[in-house]
Amino acid sequence: SSDLSACFILSVDDSMESILNWYREEGFIFKGGSGAGLNISRIRSSKELLSSGGTASGPVSFMRGADASAGTIKSGGATRRAAKMVVLDIDHPDIEEFIETKAREEDKIRALRDAGFDMDLGGRDIVSVQYQNANNSVRVSDAFMTAVEQGQPFGLTSRTEPGKVLDTVDAKELFGKIAQAAWECADPGLQYDDTINAWHTTPNSGRINASNPCSEYMSLDNSSCNLASLNLLKFLDEDDHFDVGRFTKAVELVITAMDISICFADFPTEAICETTRNFRQLGIGYANLGALLMALGLGYDSDGGRALAAAITSLMTGVSYRRSAELAAIVGPYAGYAENTEPHQAVMIKHRDANRQVHPLHDNDTTVLTAAKAEWDKVVKLGRTNGFRNAQASVLAPTGTIGFMMDCDTTGIEPDFSLVKFKKMVGGGSMQIVNQTVPRALKNLGYTPEQAEKIIAYISDNGSVVGAPVLDEAHYEVFDCAMGTRFIAPMGHVRMMAAV
């Protein structure tokens, strides 16, 4: 047996023993090439006293030790970089320090680089900069977001005396600091606590406090998830119709195999082993969505693109839970199901109802959505009879590493980065390659091979479709990418995340 999970959620309490155990557990997880996330909000703030009478260090200071440990293990011969997620609740008294931590370190990097130090990624001097080995996220509540909208004050509360307000801040100003820091250094991210827990299948066993490093897996503390992703482009048939039957069979097979794998897996701690065996969380997902949409002649930031993405995601999750209910009929539901029967079934009904809000626009999404509707009806019906084998079934991972092994043009739910890429050659130099999805897209949009050849030659020379001969301007949106002359607007990315 071996450790088959790549994603873990840990926990840490307000004690030195727990904090040092956090370092230890992360160390062993990183050594195995996996990643972990946790919420550090239970640790008392730097504005509170210790039992001995001194002032506490606060959670941000303890992040420094964990960050250094991750950086050391990463450089000690591990096969991949340590992956960390650190989460802090919006009402923690040290939240402002947490928000600005990485942005301040970025300022140091620029200053040291200008002074002549080697601050490039992997440079000899970059190791002296702190907080470079983790993703940081702020857990925001509905109450905080309402305060932001209404320009109201927001209370930061004690960890040692729950409910006691230690400081009051301007919610809109604090949100502005989050946005500014994210603009400067891409951190912190946001995790919407109330929404996350509203879709939680096992709330009677504990709330969701944190995520794995990439944020796709959100579940109980001290839990794990094994991931598997499907290459969506491989499910287009010869006529470029999405093959619902093959996709359904693939999801059934992978979910079954993933559930079996839990029985044979090792885990880094006893607590994680117990939680995973009791709740059997799985994480099937997909990659190459951006390439799929382009190949079909659908803009990433278009209603048609979002409709198909939503339909495929719904079908995948519906098939996953339906197979989970079928497995439960044979080998029994997960051990924690009895305690969470009502909330788990309620979340399945929410999924079914949400699926009904998706409106198809083309043949492909109509076919997929019809299948998804049938699957969700089965999920609700079978779940009432059999229960479920797994507390969770699907996630949408970024597939940043495995996507390339799977021959994907795009990773996770991302659009294509650019229409033209440069491939480094073994003997030196580079070769320019036009995105391989472009010819397929032009064919589906009705262009002849001769017209397509002219358009591709133009893209190769100019890196953009703008002004390409014979290309209808109405089709420009199909070729919009993350970068370039016609880059996808920020809300285009947000709308796609909302759709899936």
Name these PLM-found stretches.
Residues 5-249, 260-275, 298, 309, ...:
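Active-site cavity-forming subdomains of large catalytic enzyme subunits
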Residues 75, 233-236, 267, 295-299, ...:
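General structural signal for alpha-helix termini and helix-helix connectors
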Residues 101-102, 193-196, 203-207, 303-309, ...:
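Composition- and surface-driven signal marking solvent-exposed, interaction-prone regions
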Residues 251-287, 291-324, 428-473:
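Helical catalytic core of nucleic-acid polymerases
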